[in-house]
Amino acid sequence: MKTTISVIKADIGSLAGHHIVHPDTMAAANKVLASAKEQGIILDYYITHVGDDLQLIMTHTRGELDTKVHETAWNAFKEAAKVAKDLGLYAAGQDLLSDSFSGNVRGLGPGVAEMEIEERASEPIAIFMADKTEPGAYNLPLYKMFADPFNTPGLVIDPTMHGGFKFEVLDVYQGEAVMLSAPQEIYDLLALIGTPARYVIRRVYRNEDNLLAAVVSIERLNLIAGKYVGKDDPVMIVRLQHGLPALGEALEAFAFPHLVPGWMRGSHYGPLMPVSQRDAKATRFDGPPRLLGLGFNVKNGRLVGPTDLFDDPAFDETRRLANIVADYMRRHGPFMPHRLEPTEMEYTTLPLILEKLKDRFKKESDVYKAKESIYAKEESQGHD
């Protein structure tokens, strides 16, 4: 019997702005999932939150993209959104981009990470959930976990990991994916994933047997909705131990609070701060971007746990550095590199400002006109 782990999240409304999920909305979602468990649709579940995002962690035997499981999640979000509206919570139902369910929640707003696995004798997993950032935020940590021996010594000293891992990288603008193997193709891999707004690691497999090791939600809300409706706040499932990164190696990848896009109004770079459940809320400048990690064991579809992975003084220095970096970045105000690059601002007010001012721009004959970027050329010409 194969077990499917599904992590589905959505911003359905939050208390005091983009701050924290209200417990009454979690209770509403719990009723829906409890009913689904009684009916045998799901085997087990756990509900949590990161900032303003409601997180549903479910196990079942129905495979990925199952209609009944996704409908259960959709109904849970809809019921939670109703409560949010009754309470007058901010941005109630923000991530629910459609009024009706159509088979699965892909493209409807919620973020989805799922993996169908053959359970090992012991199946430890870590589930990472971020707020105020986008899927590419996991590119650097995933590279560290599965391709960097300075982070993961198991790549060197564990015979079952020595063959390396391959990365499925998605071009979110073109909807195309490429598989790149490490260590053989790490330079090509880095050339792509170093542009995380466009190239996102979606899945990681072990080279020797194609064992699925990690999966990331890749929904870009602005690309789905055609306008800014909030950041994507990605989730990620990582399998651990027994020929995969140890828990400590997976967590080590987040010891450096690297800069990620998102933060205030989804338009600023800031440090990704790993936090405990009690600190998984947006505060300063609607952030800084937060990361919650929960650890489980999965046994016959049952979720054993969780444990709060970043609730430990070992990450105090990471958080301290994140606060220093946050302060440094904030002092740039509305200037780059704190503010995102123009291509990432096209779903904010910037296009409206340019439209308003277009008649006031005058041609200057003695000024050299810069060439288009390589990405602008690609998008104007398309692929053959």
From Swiss-Prot:
Q: What is its EC number?
A: 3.1.3.11, 4.1.2.13
Q: What is the effect of changing D233A?
A: 2000-fold decrease in FBPase catalytic activity
Q: How does activity depend on pH?
A: Optimum pH is 8.0.
Which pathway is recorded for this entry? Carbohydrate biosynthesis; gluconeogenesis
- How the protein assembles, per its UniProt entry? Homooctamer; dimer of tetramers.
What family is it from?
Answer: Belongs to the FBP aldolase/phosphatase family.
| Name the UniProt record assigns to this protein | Fructose-1,6-bisphosphate aldolase/phosphatase
Organism this protein belongs to: Sulfurisphaera tokodaii (strain DSM 16993 / JCM 10545 / NBRC 100140 / 7)
Gene encoding this polypeptide? Answer: fbp
